[in-house]
Regions:
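Membrane-embedded beta-barrel scaffold of Gram-negative outer-membrane proteins
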Residues: 336-342, 570, 576-586, 607-663, ...
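Acidic/polar loop-and-plug regions of large Gram-negative outer-membrane beta-barrel proteins
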Residues: 242-244, 249-323, 351-405, 458-488, ...
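C-terminal beta-signal and adjacent terminal beta-strands/loops
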Residues: 734-742, 759-816
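N-terminal periplasmic accessory domains that precede
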Residues: 81-84, 103-105, 121, 138-141, ...
Length: 816
C-alpha cells in the first residue's frame, strides 16, 4: 500500500505542475459536434477481445461489443457501476441494491444472484480475477469517475480464450492518459438525497515522452432511500504515468478507493392478481422508503458464548481497496508485444440488512411465538413493546430482517503476456499466457434476525411471553445460523494461441484455443451450535452457530480447454456480417468448496461440476452519416452450474443447465442535422435443462424483452459572452419485460417502464451545465422478489425490491 501511495503522490506532484504552465494551449471542447461524433463512431477502435493490443476498428470486429464514451456514460446517469450495463443488449442488471452488490444476468446464462458471468477490467486486466464470490461481484470493486475515457463491454466472442476466459460479458474500463493538450476539469454535483459530489481531473504532458494524469472524486449523500444516515460516503483517487517508447508505450496506474455504501434489499409491498399487480404497502413509500434507520444502525451480534460483535449499517457494502498496474505494448522487430499486470488488495465487506419473512400483524407474530415456545412453560400470551418504550398496537404490521456481517479481505495478482507476428503473408499468429494468484479471507455471521415495524426507518420491538420466555430482546429475535470463517487461495495458469487469416480484402477468419488450469484451496473453521448465554428462556440466541478452532482443509484442481472460431465479411467499407462460435468454461469457486463440505464431495464432479457453455452468433454491423446498426442473433447452451440460495435460516444448493437463443440490437438514425434517435435492447428465450425439478422453466430474473429508446437533439445557440453555446436535450424510455424471481417460476415479477430526461448546456469551451432526472414518473417496478423465501409469493403483503424513485441531479463543470 505504501508503494501505491508513493506512486500516486509522484504522479500527482508531476501533473499538478500543469496548472502552473504559462503557455497558451488549446482547450478541448465540452462536446463534439454531431458530425464529429459520427466520424468517431465509424473510426472507433476497440481493444477488448482483440488479439493485439493496438485493437481493431469496432465495425471490423467479428464479435458483439458495446462501447460508451465519457459523454454517453454521463447521459445514461448510471446509479452505480452495474447500472452502466443497462446500455448493453443481452445484459440485465439489477442495480437497485445501491452502489454494490448487484445481480447481473447475461444472455440467458443461469445465475441465481450476484454476477458470475461478468468480469470487470481496468485497462484490459481484471481488477479481481474471480468474477464472483458470495457477497462479492466484480462491479462492486469499481467506482466510475472522470478519470475514465470509455468503457467497452464484450459479450461472448473470443473472450473465452483471453484474459480470465469469461464466456459471458467482459466490462473493460479504459483510463484517460495524458496528451499533448492538457485537460483540467472540476465538476460539482448536487441532487436528490442531499447529494454533494466533486470530481477533479488533471492530465497532460510532463516532459518529452512523459505524460500523466491524476483525478478522483469525493461524495456524500443520503440517497433516494434515506436510511437516516449517509447512504454513500467515500472518495477515490487515480493516477497514471505514461512513457512513450520507440514503437509503443508503457503506462503505470494506481487507484485508491475508500467508499461506504448502504445496501438495500426488499421493502414491504402488496401483491395481488397472482403477483401481476404490485401496489404500495400502507404507510410505506416503495420508491423512497427503507427499513433502515438510526435505531437499527448500530447493532450487536451474539456471535458465540462470551463473544459479541458491534457493527454499523452505514458501512454497508463498501470497499477500501487499492489497485496498481502496468500496461506495456511495443512493436519490436516485427513482433507486437504486450503485457498487462496488476495487484489488487482490499476489504469489501457486507454489513447490511437482509429482509426475511413477509409482514404480519403484531398479534399474529405474538400468536406464532406462543405456539412455538409453549412447550417451555405453557405460555398463554405476552407483551410486545418498542425498544424505545411504549406498547405495540396488535394491528401494527411487523417484519423480520437479518442484520448480517460478512467481512472479506481480497488480494490478487494477475498478468497476461501476448506476442503477435505476421508469420506468413496474411496470417497473424498470437501466442500468450495468463497467470492469476488470488486470496480471500472471510468471516461471516448470517441470521441475526431483528423484529421491527413495517414502516419507513423502522423501530425495533421487544417480545416477552408470560412464561418468562424472551422472544426478542433489543429487537433481536433470531440466532446466527451460519458463521463460516475461512481462508481461501487459488491460482490459474493459461496458455492460448490465436491465428487471424486475411483471405481477401473482404474476408477475414480467426481461430483460437486456450488451455487453463485452476487450483483452489480452503481452510474452513468447523462450526457447532449452542446457547450463547446458557439461558433456555432467551430463545433468540438458542442454537447459535459459531466457528471452532478446528479446521477442514479442502482443495481441487481443474483443467479445461476453450475454443473460438469466427469470421467477418465486408459488404462495404463500413458494413459487414460476421459469424462466431465458441466453447468456454467457468471454474468452480471458493464457495463451492465450502458448500461441498468434505473432500469427497469436492471430488465429485457430478455434484460439483465445472460449468461449460457453448455459444453461436451471427451478426451485421454498419455505420454511416444517417444511421448505424449493430444486430446479432445468438444461441447458448449451458451445462453444470451449481446454484446457492441463502434463505432466512438455511443454505440451499442445486445443479442445473440451460439453453437459450435471442436477438440483440443497437440501432441509431440521424434523419436531420443535430437529431439522433437510438434503440438498443434484446429479446431472448432461455430455459433450464438437466434438473428435473425445474427443467423447462424460464431462467430466473431475466426478461424476454428489454429495450431503451433514446432521442437527443442539439440546439446551437450561437456566440455568447462565454463563447459558442449550445443546448442538448435528451431522454430515454426503458421497457423491462416480465420475469420470474425464482427457478421454480412461482414468484412473478411484472414488466415495468421508466422515463429519464436530461439537458446539457455547453457555454463556450470552459463551462458545462448538466441537469438530469431518472424515473421521472415514479414508476413502481420490481427487480427482485424475496430471495430469502422459497415457494409462491403471489398475494397479500410481501417483501420485494423496487427500483429507485425519481432522482434529480445537477452538475457544473469548469475547464481550466
Amino acid at each position: 500500500m505504501n508503494q501505491k501511495r508513493f506512486l500516486l503522490s509522484s504522479v500527482s506532484i508531476a501533473v499538478l505542475t500543469l496548472i502552473g504552465q504559462s503557455q497558451a494551449m488549446a482547450q478541448a471542447t465540452a462536446t463534439d459536434t454531431p458530425a464529429q461524433a459520427v466520424t468517431q463512431e465509424i473510426q472507433q477502435v476497440v481493444v477488448t477481445g482483440t488479439a493485439m493490443a493496438r485493437g481493431t476498428r469496432k465495425i471490423d470486429t467479428a464479435f458483439s461489443i458495446t462501447t460508451a464514451t465519457e459523454e454517453q456514460l454521463k447521459m445514461a446517469s448510471p446509479s452505480s457501476t452495474a447500472d452502466i450495463l443497462k446500455l448493453v443488449p443481452g445484459v440485465y442488471a439489477e442495480s437497485t441494491g445501491g452502489q454494490s452488490g448487484a445481480n447481473v444476468e447475461v444472455r440467458g446464462f443461469p445465475s441465481g444472484s450476484d454476477s458470475p458471468f461478468v468480469s470487470v477490467q481496468l485497462n484490459g486486466n481484471p481488477i479481481y480475477p474471480v468474477p464472483v464470490l458470495s457477497f462479492f461481484e466484480g462491479t462492486s470493486a469499481f467506482r466510475l469517475d472522470d478519470t475514465i475515457e470509455r468503457v467497452e463491454v464484450l459479450r461472448g466472442g473470443p473472450s473465452t480464450i483471453y484474459s480470465v476466459g469469461q464466456p459471458g460479458a467482459t466490462m473493460n474500463f479504459i483510463l484517460k492518459k495524458g496528451e499533448d493538450t492538457p485537460e483540467r476539469t472540476i465538476r460539482l454535483t448536487g441532487g436528490t438525497g442531499d447529494l454533494r459530489r466533486v470530481d477533479v481531473f488533471l492530465g497532460g504532458k510532463l516532459a518529452d515522452g512523459w505524460y500523466g494524469t491524476v483525478g478522483g472524486f469525493a461524495r456524500q449523500t443520503h440517497g433516494v432511500r434515506d436510511p437516516q444516515f449517509l447512504a454513500d460516503d467515500g472518495k477515490q483517487i487515480t493516477g497514471t504515468l505514461t512513457r512513450k517508447l520507440d514503437g509503443g508505450e508503457i503506462t503505470v496506474y494506481a487507484r485508491l478507493t475508500d467508499d461506504k455504501n448502504a445496501f438495500y434489499t426488499g421493502v414491504p409491498l402488496i401483491s395481488s392478481n397472482n403477483g401481476r399487480t404490485i401496489s404500495s404497502f400502507p404507510g410505506f413509500d416503495p420508491l423512497t422508503g427503507t427499513l433502515m434507520s438510526n435505531e437499527l444502525r448500530h447493532f450487536t451480534i451474539d456471535a458465540a458464548p462470551g463473544k459479541t460483535l458491534e457493527r454499523d449499517l452505514a458501512d454497508g457494502r463498501g470497499m477500501k481497496a487499492g489497485v496498481v498496474g502496468a500496461d506495456y505494448e511495443q512493436k519490436i522487430g516485427g513482433w507486437d508485444v504486450s503485457n498487462k499486470a496488476n495487484y489488487f488488495k482490499g476489504d469489501l465487506n457486507t454489513i447490511s440488512m437482509f429482509t426475511g419473512n413477509n409482514p404480519v400483524t403484531a398479534a399474529a407474530y405474538l400468536a406464532a411465538a406462543n405456539a412455538s415456545y409453549n412447550p417451555l412453560a405453557n405460555a398463554a400470551s405476552g407483551s410486545m413493546t418498542y425498544v424505545r418504550g411504549g406498547a405495540v398496537d396488535p394491528n401494527q404490521q411487523v417484519v423480520q430482517a437479518g442484520l448480517w456481517s460478512v467481512e472479506k479481505e481480497l488480494r490478487s495478482f494477475t498478468d497476461e503476456l501476448r506476442i503477435s507476428k505476421e508469420i506468413v503473408p496474411n496470417h497473424t499468429l498470437t501466442v500468450g499466457g495468463y497467470y492469476a494468484n488470488y486470496k480471500s479471507n472471510d468471516e461471516w455471521y448470517l441470521g441475526n434476525s431483528h423484529l421491527m415495524t413495517a414502516t419507513p426507518n423502522a423501530s425495533l420491538i421487544n417480545v416477552t411471553l408470560t412464561n418468562g420466555t424472551i422472544v426478542a430482546r433489543n429487537g433481536v429475535d433470531g440466532n446466527v445460523f451460519a458463521a463460516p470463517v475461512a481462508a481461501y487461495k487459488g491460482h490459474n495458469t493459461a496458455l492460448f494461441l490465436a491465428d487471424e487469416w486475411k483471405i481477401s480484402e473482404q474476408l477475414r477468419v480467426d481461430a483460437g484455443a486456450r488451455r487453463e488450469k485452476q487450483t483452489i484451496e480452503a481452510s474452513i473453521a468447523n462450526q457447532v451450535t449452542g446457547d450463547t448465554d446458557n439461558n433456555p428462556l432467551t430463545v433468540y440466541n438458542n442454537g447459535t452457530t459459531y466457528a471452532t478452532n478446528t479446521y477442514t482443509s479442502l482443495s481441487r484442481d481443474d483443467s479445461v480447454n476453450s475454443f473460438t472460431l469466427g469470421g467477418i465479411y465486408k459488404l462495404a467499407k463500413d458494413a459487414s456480417v460476421f459469424v462466431r462460435a465458441n466453447t468456454g468454461h467457468t471454474f468452480i469457486s471458493f464457495d463451492d468448496l465450502r458448500n461441498a463440505g468434505t473432500q469427497a464431495a469436492v471430488n465429485d464432479r457430478n455434484g460439483v461440476p465445472t460449468p461449460k457453455v457453448t455459444q453461436y452468433e451471427v451478426g451485421y454491423k454498419t455505420a454511416g452519416q444517417f444511421y448505424s446498426a449493430y444486430v446479432n442473433a445468438f444461441f447458448t447452451k449451458f451445462t453444470g452450474i451449481a446454484f446457492q440460495q441463502i434463505t432466512t435460516n438455511a443454505v440451499l444448493n442445486s445443479v442445473s443447465g440451460s439453453r437459450g437463443h435471442g436477438v440483440e440490437f443497437e440501432l441509431a438514425v440521424r434523419p436531420i442535422t443535430n437529431l439522433q434517435v437510438t434503440l438498443s435492447g434484446d429479446w431472448q428465450n432461455s430455459e433450464y435443462r438437466d434438473n428435473p425439478a425445474i427443467a423447462g422453466n424460464d431462467v430466473q430474473r431475466q426478461p424476454k424483452l428489454q429495450f431503451r429508446l433514446t432521442p437527443s437533439y442539439r440546439i446551437p445557440l450561437g456566440d455568447t459572452a462565454l463563447g459558442a453555446t449550445d443546448l442538448k436535450l435528451y431522454g430515454t424510455y426503458t421497457h423491462i419485460g416480465e420475469r420470474w424471481a425464482d427457478q421454480a417460476n412461482l414468484s412473478y415479477l411484472p414488466s415495468y417502464k421508466t422515463f429519464d430526461i436530461g439537458a446539457l448546456a455547453t457555454l463556450g469551451s470552459n463551462w458545462e451545465v448538466r441537469v438530469s432526472a431518472t424515473n421521472l414518473t415514479n414508476e413502481l417496478g420490481l427487480t427482485e422478489g424475496n430471495s430469502r423465501l422459497t415457494g409462491a409469493q403471489s398475494s397479500g403483503p410481501i417483501n420485494a425490491r423496487p427500483i429507485f424513485g425519481r432522482a434529480v441531479e445537477a452538475s457544473l463543470l469548469y475547464r481550466f
